[in-house]
């Protein structure tokens, strides 16, 4: 078994260094999905294995009973998708296909993850030797630690997101808002309970910090409901994974969609709205939305969506609700 101390000493950098091995000639935008997918897969497998061993020790024969896991918010991992099985095939030519099959098997057993996990590890552009090396590195890292597993992986996931955003420069801001900015918004709004909404949620950082705020103030995370939306399918999936590893069940719509042209929460009136919308968005679709009911304070300019974002949020705000917006 891997040394659990690795989870608290340079853990984030250890994972990031492993990610860099995979990069090769790929752009950050391409390989971040591979890396974040592997982190997610290793984490849910580790968490499953811990519960599995606990059930084996109890001796009642329930270690393959899916209800034993889902009742505790643990994703069920089928035998062929467990990390121990993947690790044995790390240095075979089929390792990419093995991981893709594992992702499909996990989605099949866990409806919440359907169509969310990346399944592009078998593609020719991904160096299978390097992929096997990263699997080896992850095999020797324990992704969970009793009593704080969500925070450990959450911290790692957030660290990698920030590093990817830094590498991608301006484009990285589309899926990641610096944690210091997010914390400031959350501390001002104080979302203790009620409906929390982010109309351009990126990787879900606003929701994660809201949940942390509730937990840090001895509140109950079940007292907040999470609603969000993002137009980028890859980012939407990142948000789903980011929230899943923290035990947060959001409503991000059935699919990724443009907030202006396809509002996935048309009747929502949120108690807290926090967002970092794309600044000065020029081509946002006003020609199709001139008569939209959201424009109570005048039609926004066609060449700049800033006023449209503000009005969209006001439209979705409950009578006593509060907005925190980065603009």
Regions from the PLM with identified roles:
Residues 42-55, 164, 214, 218, ...:
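A generic secondary-structure signal for well-formed alpha-helical elements
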Residues 1-10, 46, 261-271, 280-327:
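Signature of N6-adenine DNA methyltransferases within the class I
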Residues 1-192, 251-264:
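Non-catalytic, mostly N-terminal accessory regions of nucleic-acid modification and defense proteins
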Residues 171-275, 280-284, 289-293, 327:
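Conserved S-adenosyl-L-methionine
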Residues 14, 21, 30-43, 185, ...:
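Conserved Class I SAM-dependent methyltransferase catalytic core
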Residues 6, 10-17, 35, 39, ...:
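Generic recognition of stable, solvent-exposed alpha-helical segments in well-folded globular domains
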